Amino acid sequence: MKNTSRMIFQVAVGPQSNLYAHCIESVSNYCDKHDITHHVLTAPQLWIKPDPFNSGRSEESYMKYGGYLPIYEKENAFNYLPEFDQIAIVDADIYIREDAPNIFDDMSDDAAFGAVVERDMPIEDWYKNKIINYSQMQYGQLHSNASDFRPNELGFEFCNMGLIVLNLSLIHI
């Protein structure tokens, strides 16, 4: 895609660790290098609090962010859909190397959505076990003949939502 408007959206609400600050800075530098708008949401807007009785989440997992889960704040990126041709939603703990190519240039023009199927990544054995357990916990009850999550020896197929790329010209809103 030529002459497109692009944005990387990140969520960094609540107390920030040195890791998050370092990673967000790497994304900012990457955006400057590739002429990409960079937006970091630093104050929650949705304030979605999980139900600890139904979610199985520990209280500590969301109280450290003020009583809600920042993952839901990623949805605020959708507010920018009319303004950009492409948007990437990037977790605040992802570091982008200085020599990384422009991810938008690697996104196929005929793909509306890009993400990583986590089990297909080159991963260590200890992490394979983590993915198998996680996917079984999340998708085991949902899997049926009506909805196929394509299970294999590494668990169910799911995308790691830490990096999402959207080609908005192919998404009808």
Description of each model-found segment:
Residues 51-90, 96-105, 112-115, 159:
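A conserved donor-nucleotide-binding helix/loop in the catalytic core
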Residues 1-62, 69, 73, 82-83, ...:
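N-terminal anchoring/stem segment of glycosyltransferases
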Residues 31, 78, 93, 164:
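A residue-level signal for conserved active-site and pocket-lining positions in enzyme catalytic cores
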Residues 135-155:
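Short, flexible, basic/aromatic active-site loop/helix in glycosyltransferases
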Residues 9, 39, 88-90, 114-115, ...:
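Hydrophobic/aromatic beta-strand patches that form the interior of the parallel beta-sheet core
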Residues 98-134:
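Conserved donor-nucleotide/metal-binding helix-loop-beta segment in metal-dependent transferases, i.e.
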Residues 157, 162-166:
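Short glycine- and hydrophobic/aromatic-rich loop-to-beta-strand nucleating segment
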Residues 172-173:
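Conserved small/polar residues in nucleotide/adenosyl-binding loops
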